[in-house]
């Protein structure tokens, strides 16, 4: 189109079909209308099927993940119960061991005390026995020392007779 022509004649419509490319546009629009829906429809259908498949896969993974989460929660609660049971058992066991240790310590202390008392009493009885022995020896020595001065012949004769009678009786 000529610009000088437009400037001189003013605004107008051009109805010449060959100049305006209306036929070309009509062919293109008709082709798009006729062939584009089947071609574009197939592409959109494939894309839609792909999206639906991905959504179904995502939903399946969500279901599996939910099941796995539920199982993990159940396992966790079971493990927590088992841990608390083990903790309670270990507390009971440690308390039992502590009580047993205290009992053994008390028994050992009593045994040591009894041993000390028996050692002390055996020491005391040995000392008493030793003192008695020394007292008897001292008394015998004193008696023997004083005996010659006290014994006269009649007393000595009576003593010998009495000793003989004692021997005969036994």
Curated annotation (Swiss-Prot):
Protein name (Swiss-Prot/TrEMBL): ATP synthase subunit b
GO cellular component terms listed in the entry, alphabetical order: plasma membrane-derived thylakoid membrane; proton-transporting ATP synthase complex
PANTHER family xrefs: ATP SYNTHASE SUBUNIT B, CHLOROPLASTIC (PTHR34264:SF3)
Function: F(1)F(0) ATP synthase produces ATP from ADP in the presence of a proton or sodium gradient. F-type ATPases consist of two structural domains, F(1) containing the extramembraneous catalytic core and F(0) containing the membrane proton channel, linked together by a central stalk and a peripheral stalk. During catalysis, ATP synthesis in the catalytic domain of F(1) is coupled via a rotary mechanism of the central stalk subunits to proton translocation. Component of the F(0) channel, it forms part of the peripheral stalk, linking F(1) to F(0).
Entry's Gene Ontology molecular function annotations: proton-transporting ATP synthase activity, rotational mechanism
Entry-linked InterPro entries: ATP_synth_B-like_membr_sf, ATP_synth_b/b'su_bac/chlpt
Family the UniProt entry places it in: Belongs to the ATPase B chain family.
Major subcellular location class: membrane
Keywords noted in UniProt: ATP synthesis, CF(0), Hydrogen ion transport, Ion transport, Membrane, Thylakoid, Transmembrane, Transmembrane helix, Transport
Pfam families: ATP-synt_B
Taxonomic lineage of the native organism: Bacteria, Bacillati, Cyanobacteriota, Cyanophyceae, Synechococcales
Record membrane topology: Single-pass membrane protein
Residue intervals passing through the bilayer: 15-37
Keyword check for Metal-binding: no
Self-association state and partner proteins as the record states: F-type ATPases have 2 components, F(1) - the catalytic core - and F(0) - the membrane proton channel. F(1) has five subunits: alpha(3), beta(3), gamma(1), delta(1), epsilon(1). F(0) has four main subunits: a(1), b(1), b'(1) and c(10-14). The alpha and beta chains form an alternating ring which encloses part of the gamma chain. F(1) is attached to F(0) by a central stalk formed by the gamma and epsilon chains, while a peripheral stalk is formed by the delta, b and b' chains.
Subcellular location: Cellular thylakoid membrane
Keyword DNA repair part of the UniProt annotation: no
């Amino acid at each position: 189109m000529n610009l000088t022509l437009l400037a001189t004649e003013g605004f107008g419509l051009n109805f010449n079909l060959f100049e305006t490319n209306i036929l070309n546009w009509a062919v293109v629009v008709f082709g798009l209308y006729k062939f584009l829906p089947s071609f574009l429809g197939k592409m959109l259908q494939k894309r839609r099927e792909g999206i639906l498949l991905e959504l179904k896969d995502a939903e399946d993974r969500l279901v599996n993940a939910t099941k796995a989460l539920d199982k993990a929660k159940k396992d966790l609660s079971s493990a927590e119960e088992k841990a608390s049971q083990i903790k309670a058992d270990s507390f009971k066991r440690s308390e039992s061991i502590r009580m047993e240790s205290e009992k053994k310590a008390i028994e050992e202390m009593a045994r040591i005390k009894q041993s000390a008392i028996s050692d002390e009493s055996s020491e005391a009885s040995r000392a008493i026995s030793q003192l008695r022995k020394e007292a008897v020896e001292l008394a015998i020595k004193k008696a023997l020392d004083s005996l010659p001065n006290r014994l006269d012949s009649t007393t000595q004769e009576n003593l010998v007779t009495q000793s003989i009678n004692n021997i005969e009786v036994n």
